[in-house]
């Protein structure tokens, strides 16, 4: 999954160890959170898209943790309080 994450982020296959470790940590934390939302069940392979999408969201927010929005020179960014909010219907459907 790390290779897919690098590709989606536009990173080369070979990256420095610190960045690779950061990506692995993001993937691990995202998978753990999804496992919690699934009531302790291991996320099935069909939910890998959720892990990847949320990992991208979390990677792009590095340095802005705790903020709900950010504006600089006319550019405004905002983040959901729950990175999984857009996937809750899929998660509920899986649990049903």
Task: Identify what each model region corresponds to.
Residues 47-48, 52-96:
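Short loop/turn elements at secondary-structure junctions
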């Amino acid at each position: 999954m790390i290779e897919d994450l690098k590709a989606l982020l536009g990173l080369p296959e070979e990256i420095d160890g610190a960045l690779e470790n950061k990506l692995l940590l993001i993937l691990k934390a995202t998978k753990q959170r999804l496992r919690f939302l699934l009531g302790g069940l291991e996320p099935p392979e069909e939910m890998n898209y959720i892990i990847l999408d949320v990992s991208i969201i979390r990677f792009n927010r590095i340095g802005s943790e705790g903020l709900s929005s950010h504006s600089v020179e006319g550019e405004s960014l905002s983040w959901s309080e729950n990175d999984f909010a857009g996937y809750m219907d899929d998660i509920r459907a899986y649990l049903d």
